[in-house]
């Protein structure tokens, strides 16, 4: 699949050279604070995620894109955004989730919203998905603001089976 472009971003498939900067992102406690149990990931687990992301593209025709700034000749990894099946929360299945994770230096620039809008549009227009969810820690105000900008509304809250913490489930429908 060819890369996609927004006004400021390139949404592309993962490359081997993305693994090192992705491991740095996943080792940042602030980045990981609201993800699962909030634990940082070591290099091996981080690399495993990249493999899983690519397999999801092959199996489903959608997945999580690597993000780079448009015009950055090095295509330095800023993080990821895209669509995935939230297997970690079986109570919402069958479902598709839009998710994102950005390096801290990319926070506050509107990149998550810009990339998530592109991912949701892709899901609706090219994948035939009718509803897209986002599963968010209730204390993650930044991600909740992104969800609001996407027009997402609350669905019933759930309990994360691994952490036993409440998570907010928000969604947007194709024709809403």
Model-predicted regions and their roles:
Residues 53-66:
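A short helix-loop-beta-strand connector motif used in the catalytic cores of GNAT acetyltransferases and
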Residues 1-34, 51, 66-176:
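Acyl-donor (CoA/ACP) binding surface of acyl/acetyltransferases
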């Amino acid at each position: 699949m060819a890369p996609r472009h927004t006004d400021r971003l390139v949404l592309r498939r993962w490359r081997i050279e993305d693994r090192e900067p992705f491991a740095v992102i996943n080792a940042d406690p602030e980045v990981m604070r609201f993800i699962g149990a909030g634990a940082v990931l070591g290099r091996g687990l981080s690399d495993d995620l990249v493999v899983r992301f690519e397999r999801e593209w092959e199996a489903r025709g959608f997945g999580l894109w690597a993000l780079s700034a448009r015009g950055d000749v090095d295509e330095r990894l800023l993080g990821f955004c895209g669509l995935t099946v939230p297997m970690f929360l079986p109570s919402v299945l069958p479902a598709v989730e839009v998710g994102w994770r950005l390096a801290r230096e990319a926070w506050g620039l509107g990149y998550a919203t810009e990339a998530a809008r592109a991912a949701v549009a892709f899901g609706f227009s090219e994948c035939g998905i009718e509803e897209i969810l986002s599963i968010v820690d209730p204390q993650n105000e930044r991600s909740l603001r992104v969800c609001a900008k996407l027009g997402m509304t609350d669905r019933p809250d759930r309990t994360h089976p691994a952490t036993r913490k409440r998570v907010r489930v928000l969604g947007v429908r194709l024709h809403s």
